[in-house]
Amino acid sequence: MSNAITMGIFWHLIGAASAACFYAPFKQVKQWSWETMWSVGGIVSWLILPWAISALLLPDFWAYYGQFNLSTLLPVFLFGAMWGIGNINYGLTMRYLGMSMGIGIAIGITLIVGTLMTPIINGNFDVLIHTEGGRMTLLGVFVALIGVGIVTRAGQLKERKMGIKAEEFNLKKGLLLAVMCGIFSAGMSFAMNAAKPMHEAAAALGVDPLYVALPSYVVIMGGGALVNLGFCFIRLAKVQNLSIKADFSLSRPLIISNILLSALGGLMWYLQFFFYAWGHARIPAQYDYMSWMLHMSFYVLCGGLVGLVLKEWKNAGRRPVAVLSLGCVVIIIAANIVGLGMTS
């Protein structure tokens, strides 16, 4: 496996680790509605950071974006909005199916859709079937799915042992939302594919290859922000027991603490895609769609490991932990299969 591909896989692992940890600061926020907390974190992650980093990277911020016509920017924005819808459905999926089943189905679907639809859209699916490297990366995708399934099973065993149930279990509604979540969440993969002209333009301006994808986040995450913030603001305006005014009527130290914690969560959320861009830059162009598979499978891997570190599995017993460990090993094997396939 080449050093470039090894580093690409490593950066995807770092990004996924940040994704697995980003909600920890949000859990420390006190006496705020979820909508206010999510909005503050989202403003940091979807608006402030993409704009600020792009302004630092680009020699002429407005000239860069002004060179693209609507036919280039609109698909990138709409795929970002599609991914934003997936974000909202993710929370509802957990509500009706529980964490383990919800994550397993949603992540499994988005892993397949986001990874395999991109070469189909680009007319390159034959690379997966008719080349040795393509067949090997395809094998890696299916091994990763097995790993996700094993980790999901471990989570179910843990929930059963600890008596954890879905907030409002509804299999029919939960499965529908999980499928929608999986499909719509793949919008980020499609957006990155649609943003290739933006990446090429950034490279032409002398932006380091590791950073060329970051300016496109202004548009991609702008679409996601529109959906997520719109959802939160509508709820804050219409739901009777929710109020921004009440959330900001707390003591000043608590407000400052909540803002800082939400901002930290937003920063960690953004870092997942900051390092995703680094990993994406190291993946061979003909296999760039594999970035999504690596990110999502590593997200499940890191989520399990973070849970162990935070002692969330302490009272689950040996069997769930053993099954979790097996699933993590399978995901690591899948990443290595994909890496070897990309060097073939």
Curated annotation (Swiss-Prot):
Its main location: membrane. It catalyses: L-rhamnopyranose(in) + H(+)(in) = L-rhamnopyranose(out) + H(+)(out). It comes from the Bacteria. GO terms for cellular component: plasma membrane. The keyword Transmembrane applies. GO terms for molecular function: rhamnose transmembrane transporter activity; symporter activity. The chain crosses the membrane at residues 4-24, 38-58, 68-88, 101-121, 137-157, 175-195, 214-234, 259-279, 290-310, 321-341. The keyword Transmembrane helix applies. This is L-rhamnose-proton symporter. Keywords: Cell inner membrane, Cell membrane, Membrane, Sugar transport, Symport, Transmembrane, Transmembrane helix, Transport. It holds the Pfam family RhaT. It comes from Salmonella gallinarum (strain 287/91 / NCTC 13346). Uptake of L-rhamnose across the cytoplasmic membrane with the concomitant transport of protons into the cell (symport system). InterPro entries: L-rhamnose-proton_sym_RhaT. Belongs to the L-rhamnose transporter (TC 2.A.7.6) family. It is found in: Cell inner membrane. It is a multi-pass membrane protein.
